[in-house]
């Protein structure tokens, strides 16, 4: 039997059709309390822009609220898309969070803009090339370090100094993996929506991992992989709930702007095969089936942790899946 690695949750704060962003955020905070109670290791908020059905845009604000309503769980960004942000402001925001909530804050960093080219331009402040990304991380570590000063300039941040907020590199390709490895940082791989290079990325990350890099934070490679999960008491219920996710991905593909759709008869979803190919890393079914799928993935990849993404039209169904998963995994 493969190891039951720690489980975490990735939240995109979905907005069901007919609901408001306020509803989505409230449901998300309810789920945060539940995740804390159930023993999940971390709860990370994504960053998305110009999307109708998602309310995770200002991640640091969601993290602050979630950390305030929970006690034990680590809360973090999955992730901050660095091309959209000035690193000093990221240091100040996450340093402030660490000062308020102690060692419970994680900072996952990505190089993608998390949106379409036009919106990216509206947000943009800098290049997304690997060298700037590495330089930004080096500066962030300076601000989070005991001296509280950037590595590239004598700029001080009182609110981040000495907080040592752990930094993760997010990526879905071999390029992201090689950056994470060379910098000696933990790697969160976006297998939940970008399955193409996952196996190669994990392998390359471990191969190039450099524990003696000036940015290194850990002594050996650490991989957390994203997985789409929908666990219900029966296979049939799970398959039906899963149609909400299929519809969501097909909407993105077709440029359709609407909230999360109610579940439908699985046979009625046109192009469901396309959605499932993007969502190759999915565990959908009853407890036994889902646990088996996750065990198999952990066995094949030897990842250190899984971060699950679960979407449902009705927030109660999402929480039911989290509860069943915790009961059957922990």
Identify the residue ranges that each predicted region occupies:
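Hydrophobic faces of well-ordered beta-strands that scaffold small-molecule active sites
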Residues: 7-11, 43-45, 75-77, 105-109, ...
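Short, acidic/polar
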Residues: 22-34, 172-178, 289-296
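Flexible, glycine-rich active-site loops centered on histidine and acidic residues
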Residues: 2-21, 83-147, 187, 195
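A conserved active-site cap/scaffold subdomain adjacent to cofactor or substrate pockets
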Residues: 175-196, 201-202
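N-terminal beta1-alpha1-beta2 module of alpha/beta enzyme domains
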Residues: 1-73
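Active-site mouth loops of central-metabolism enzymes
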Residues: 11-26, 80-88, 161-171, 232, ...
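Conserved, mostly hydrophobic/aromatic
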Residues: 7, 35, 39, 47, ...
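An alpha-helical appendage that flanks or caps ligand/catalytic pockets
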Residues: 3, 127-156, 197-303, 330
């Amino acid at each position: 039997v493969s190891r039951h690695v720690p489980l975490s949750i990735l939240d995109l704060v979905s907005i069901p059709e007919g609901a408001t962003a306020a509803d989505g955020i409230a449901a998300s905070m309810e789920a945060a309390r539940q995740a804390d109670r159930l023993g999940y290791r971390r709860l990370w908020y994504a960053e998305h822009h110009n999307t109708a059905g998602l309310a995770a845009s200002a991640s640091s604000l969601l993290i602050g609220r979630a950390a305030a309503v929970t006690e034990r769980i680590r809360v973090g960004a999955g992730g901050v898309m660095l091309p959209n942000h000035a690193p000093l402001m990221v240091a100040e925001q996450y340093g402030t969070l660490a000062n308020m909530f102690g060692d419970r804050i994680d900072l996952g960093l990505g190089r993608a803009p998390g949106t379409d080219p036009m919106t990216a331009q509206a947000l943009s402040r800098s290049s997304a090339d690997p060298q700037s990304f590495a330089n930004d991380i080096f500066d962030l570590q300076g601000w989070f370090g005991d001296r509280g000063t950037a590595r590239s300039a004598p700029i001080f941040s009182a609110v981040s100094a000495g907080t040592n907020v752990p930094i993760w590199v997010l990526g879905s390709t071999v390029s992201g993996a090689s950056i994470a490895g060379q910098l000696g940082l933990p790697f969160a791989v976006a297998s939940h929506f970008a399955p193409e290079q996952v196996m190669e990325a994990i392998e390359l990350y471990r191969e190039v991992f450099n524990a003696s890099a000036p940015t290194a934070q850990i002594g050996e490679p650490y991989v957390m992989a994203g997985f789409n999960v929908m666990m219900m008491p029966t296979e049939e219920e799970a398959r039906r709930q899963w149609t909400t996710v299929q519809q969501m991905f097909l909407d993105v593909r077709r440029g359709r702007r609407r909230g999360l759709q109610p579940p439908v008869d699985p046979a009625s979803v046109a192009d469901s095969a396309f959605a499932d190919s993007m969502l190759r890393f999915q565990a959908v079914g009853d407890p036994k089936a889902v646990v088996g799928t996750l065990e198999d993935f952990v066995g094949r990849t030897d990842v250190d942790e899984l971060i699950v993404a679960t979407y449902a039209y009705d927030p109660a169904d999402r929480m039911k899946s989290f509860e069943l998963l915790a009961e059957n995994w922990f």
